[in-house]
Design a protein with these regions (language model features):
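A short acidic, Gly/Pro-enriched loop at the edge of an enzyme's catalytic core
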Residues: 80-92
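A short glycine-rich, Lys/Arg-flanked "PGG" loop and its adjoining helix->strand segment in the class I
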Residues: 108-120
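C-terminal lobe and adjacent flexible extensions of AdoMet/dcAdoMet transferase-like proteins
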Residues: 186, 190-252
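Conserved alpha-helix/loop element of class I SAM-dependent methyltransferases that forms part
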Residues: 5-22
Length: 252
């Protein structure tokens, strides 16, 4: 339905709301081919990209060779063991690892690594997928009549572990889907002060005519206005497909 455009714009504006001023050092952990890394580099940040998938890092390196604003580095690395000195970054982005790491201990390891590499007062922006995303997506796209898809959704709602035994790529890969409050707790458990918990898209991502609305500037602004108005409302945060939590490493 094209709602990734809403996700990307809202993620960027939420990052900038909490980001230090450039030319601060930013680690984009799980940064894939650099969708957010290159954007931040263009804004003047010193960005180091890390991803566990060599193919994606290769794409980022090739892009970096011709980028007008280059990344400091592009490296293959595991979010749970970053090849970075302690207290070396002003901001860490974890915009994928927390839903790709299904085991809670692995997620805590990734968050602990982010805490270690951040300087005191440094910012973390971590993304999650809502526990309810597959149910709402299935409802919007009329997929819940499919028994196999409905079974996947039932499991998602029980324990948050999204398992896709089918060959349908639209059903996403194995992942962990957070309740909003659990994402907050995971950051707090490793020592972060949580400064904001946001629903990224609001309700608009579920609209069947999303692309038509987004392509109309006036209707697009309405989608954004509603997403911003509801972003911190606890009763509806989980209706967004994606969650974003902002935390800060204490200075004391």
């Amino acid at each position: 339905m094209g709602a990734f455009r809403l996700e990307a714009l809202r993620t960027r504006e939420l990052i900038l709301r909490h980001a230090p001023k450039p030319p601060a050092v930013v680690l984009d952990v799980g940064g894939a081919a650099g969708a957010y890394s290159f954007w931040l580099a263009e804004l003047g940040y010193a960005v180091r990209l890390f991803d566990a998938v060599p193919r994606l890092v290769d794409v980022a390196r090739q892009r970096n060779e011709r980028a007008p604003s280059r990344l400091t580095s592009c490296s293959v690395a595991d979010a749970r063991a970053l090849p970075e000195p302690s207290e070396s970054a002003a901001m860490v982005l974890l915009l994928g690892p927390l839903y790709h790491l299904v085991d809670e201990d692995d997620r805590q390891s990734a968050l602990s690594e982010a805490f270690r590499v951040l300087e005191p007062g440094g910012v973390i922006m971590a993304a999650g997928i809502s526990r309810f995303a597959s149910a709402l997506d299935g409802l919007a796209r009329e997929l819940l009549g499919d028994r196999e898809f409905a079974h996947i959704v039932e499991r998602d709602l029980i324990d948050g572990v999204h398992r896709n035994p089918t060959n349908q790529l639209d059903d996403f890969t194995t992942a962990y889907f957070h309740r909003p409050e659990d994402l907050r707790h995971e950051l707090a458990n490793v020592g972060f002060d949580v400064e904001g918990l946001y629903g990224v898209e609001g309700l608009g991502w579920m609209l069947s005519d999303f692309s038509e609305r987004w392509d109309d500037p006036e209707r697009r602004e309405i989608l954004l206005r509603v997403a911003r108005a509801l972003e911190s409302e606890p009763s509806v945060i989980g209706s967004s497909a994606h969650l974003l939590v902002a935390g800060r490493k204490p200075t004391g």
